[in-house]
Each structure stands twice: as structure tokens, then as C-alpha cells.
Regions:
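N-terminal, active-site-proximal structural segment of metallo-dependent hydrolase catalytic domains
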Residues: 1-49, 226-227
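Active-site metal-binding loops of divalent metal-dependent hydrolases
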Residues: 10, 37, 114-116, 145-147, ...
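Active-site environment of divalent metal-dependent phosphoester hydrolases
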Residues: 12-15, 39-42, 63, 119-122, ...
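His/acidic metal-ligating clusters that form di-metal
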Residues: 100-104, 108-110, 124-147, 155-156
Length: 227
């Protein structure tokens, strides 16, 4: 089963939900892993523009919630999801992960949308907490989001010891895969990690004018095949 995955920090849709959707629409993602998803209304507008369905705490009446989201395009559907807030996360900007099970025609995939913080020690602790959370998940696992650090930093290294880094295994060899800042990308801080049941067929960063204007992060798109 083929699956196209989008990873994007949309910065609260400050450029507008429709603008963010226009940046990725032609690539028709089956699954989107969104960070800084913003308000309920803006996320709903983004979903409508892309004809996708959400699993997101932003659609629940919770104050100061984790602002990540997992979106799917029919015939994929959200089977269930829950939100895990990382321990010792800041009260006014909580970090965490949305853990969703998505399904289609007998396939089940675990999709984890994560946003790590700005402090290195905190990121490492939360990366360990993330992998503990994923222990025992059956079937394909996709972990995507904004990790706020480079590939050689401790939290990302922790994950690459346990999952495949999709860019390292399928990224454009003529590109560094940098996603931040969008107006002059020099850092690869947005990632998709996949479990061994998933084959990476290709990965690329969208860097045209529309993508650059949609957020301070560029979108990452990855094609995978599920065993």
C-alpha cells in the first residue's frame, strides 16, 4: 500500500489556512502531520481546503492544549487517537504528541505527530519518552514533526537509532533537506521517521514561492510503501 505523507509546521496558519493548503495541495497527501496547528477554526478551514479529516486536540475545547494534528484523506480514516503531553512540559506552551491509528482496507498505521521544544536537554528527555510511548505498537509506525534540532543532535540521534530517517533513506541527493527558516533554509529540523515495516520511496522539500510564504517552515513530503 502506497502512502504520501506531509510533515509541516504551519505556524498557527498565520499566513492563512488556505495559503498553507495551496502550498501542498498539488501533492495530494494521504496523511499530514501538522505542528503549531493553531485554532480550531483555522485548522478546520485547512482541512476543508485539502479535503482531509483531522485527529487533533485543536478540535477539542481544551485550553493550552498540544497543538499538533494528524490529518487523513479518504478513503483513509482515523480509527482512534489520543494526546500525550510530555512530562515537565511548559504550562503555557505544552509539548507533546498526537498518537493516531489510521486505517484503510485492512491496513492499520500508527501516526505520531510531535513537536519538541527549544531546550536541548528537554528535547532529549522527550525523545526518550516518545520512544517509550511507541514501545509495543503493532504494525507500521510513522513519527513526524518539528524536532527543533539537526540530524546530529541528541534527540534526533536517539530516534535514528530506533527508526529510519526518511530523508537519509529517500531524500533528494542534491538537497540537504533544509526546512527552516523558509525564506533562507539552512537547517533540517522537520523529520519523518519510519519503522522497519515501511519502505521510503522518495522524499522532497517544497521550496517554491507559495511554500515559502505559507509558514516559517517548509513542507516535507515523503512517499512510503507499507509492507
Amino acid at each position: 500500500m502506497d502512502l504520501r505523507v506531509l510533515v509541516h509546521n504551519v505556524k498557527g496558519f498565520k499566513a492563512g489556512p488556505e495559503q498553507a493548503a495551496a502550498a501542498v495541495a498539488e501533492h495530494v497527501p494521504d496523511l499530514a502531520m501538522i505542528t503549531e496547528a493553531g485554532t480550531r477554526r483555522r485548522l478546520e478551514r485547512y482541512c476543508r481546503a485539502l479535503e482531509m479529516e483531522p485527529a487533533a486536540p485543536s478540535l477539542l475545547p481544551l485550553a493550552r492544549s498540544v497543538r499538533n494534528a494528524v490529518l487523513v484523506r479518504p478513503p483513509w480514516r482515523v480509527v482512534r487517537f489520543h494526546v500525550h503531553r510530555f512530562h515537565a512540559s511548559r504550562r503555557f506552551y505544552p509539548r507533546g504528541v498526537v498518537v493516531a491509528v489510521i486505517g484503510r482496507a485492512g491496513y492499520r498505521v500508527h501516526a505520531l505527530a510531535v513537536h519538541l521544544g527549544l531546550a536541548g536537554e528537554e528535547r532529549r528527555r522527550h525523545a526518550e519518552e516518545l520512544t517509550d510511548l511507541a514501545v509495543g505498537l503493532q504494525g507500521p509506525v510513522l513519527v513526524g514533526g518539528d524536532f527543533n534540532e539537526s540530524a546530529r543532535s541528541p534527540a534526533v540521534q536517539w530516534l535514528t537509532e530506533r527508526y529510519w530517517d526518511s530523508w537519509a533513506h529517500g531524500g533528494d541527493r542534491d538537497s540537504a533537506g533544509s526546512t527552516f527558516p523558509s525564506n533562507d533554509p539552512t537547517s533540517r529540523i522537520d523529520y519523518l521517521f519510519v519503522s522497519e515495516q515501511v519502505r521510503v520511496d522518495g522524499a522532497w522539500v517544497l521550496a517554491d514561492e507559495t511554500a515559502r510564504a505559507s509558514s516559517d517552515h517548509l513542507p516535507l513530503v515523503v512517499d512510503v510503501t507499507l509492507d
